[in-house]
Amino acid sequence: MFDFSIVTNWLHTFLMGTCGFAEWGAILTESILVALVIITLYAVFAIALIYMERKVCAFFQCRLGPMRVGKWGILQVFSDVFKMLTKEIISMRQSDLFLHNLAPFLVVTASMVTFACLPWNKGAHIIDFNVGVFFFLAMSSIGVVGILLAGWSSNNKYSLIGAMRSGAQIISYELSIGMTMLAMICLTGTMSFSEICNDQYLNGWNICRGHIPAVIAFLIYLVAGNAECNRGPFDLPECESELTAGYHTEYSGMHFGYYYLAEYLNLFICAGMASTIFLGGWAPLHIYGLDAFNGVMDVIPGAVWFIGKTFFVVFLLMWLRWTFPRLRIDQILSLEWKYLVPFSMVNLVLMALCVAMGWTF
């Protein structure tokens, strides 16, 4: 398995040795390069996910989807982006302009920081703390502040109702996500994402060696993650039939585009975290006793494994969205507090018991 830290160490040595940069200059240059990489990946994956969403939706509805702009409609997303860039940004007269303009940037910032937590390959992790899981959960909650500010500052009752729904929904379902992650922390014994992936590379994917509690945690995570992203059938904060467009009703132009961008990147982040915690992240598929097969799997780059697993989970989440009908807000909160939270707590105890008794593969 290729270790990407070789490249980062070479770059640091090149900047300090060949280019003659001081320590602070080399670190500053590396930080700028990393920021450019994050922004580029952010844009590329957003475009890919929007196109994938339209094609998957069309598949489930027996349609073709975008087919006119470019070959197989590939350029449709770019035309939509161009249209959004040329639209005027309009603000309501009675709205709080400062908070109204600040809210979309808070949502995108939270999405970018959590996007940087994903371990792309062995040695290729931008943010890697020994409490990485807690940091991820803390940063992901910043987006709630942006949504609440958007609803309140718009001076629109529909926006405010959508923001309050979204805040209640996201805060509620964070409990289930946190407890499913705690179950996997019990299994791996660490909160660092790089160490979680390394542990699965050596001992097998968590969903395979964690027995039934790991499978239950994975299913709960899929449901809670879908609700966390405000996607169907949990898209009550922006349901068109009731609230026009929810908390971003009064947004236009690229301010609306930021919310659209953050929604799809949050979907990718949710799926990427599922592949990291449960499916090994960049760790390849290994089958005990088949050394030749395992050697071939190790040749495939870790980034390919990670992106492939992530898009598989993205497809599962899109499948959920276009299959199930929308729930009412009371049904959504009842599902979390009456079912998912108790199941998550019991499942966490079961996982701790399995680890304590050594009942893992």
Give, region by region, the residue ranges found by the protein language model.
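Selective transmembrane helix interface/packing segments
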Residues: 1-361
